[in-house]
Amino acid sequence: MKQLILVSFLIAFNVKADDFSDINTLLDGLHEDAHRGNFEAYFGRYSSDAVFLGTDKTERWTIQEFKSYAKPAFADGHGWTYKVIERNWEGNGNTRWFDEILFNEKLGHCRGTGVVELINDEWKIAHYALTMLVPNSIAAD
């Protein structure tokens, strides 16, 4: 019985570790595709009903709206570049959520947060929000 429990624990742990490895690959690929302007590959990482929140208060886009916004930026083979500084994960079942600290030459340090879902055995980004980080010391009281 103890062996069965141990084997079950090890299998569950490995599945979770594999999931997080797959999701890290998904997001690392997202940022690489954006950097290289790989439009189809970039948007292929999102679910068909994904939502993207940009840094401006008006930037709440369905995936189709986000594609329209991004197409000109990707047209010359360059999108945008964010370097991943750190990433954290939580979740269970077919849903995971994450936060990541990014660096962009124009915007400085930013935070990306999002939700990924396992859809047809493939992790897809269902929600992504990009925010600029503002130190508390310079924020208005």
Show the residue positions of the predicted features.
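A short gly/proline-enriched turn/hairpin at secondary-structure junctions
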Residues: 50-61, 72-77
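Sec-dependent signal peptide recognition
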Residues: 1-7
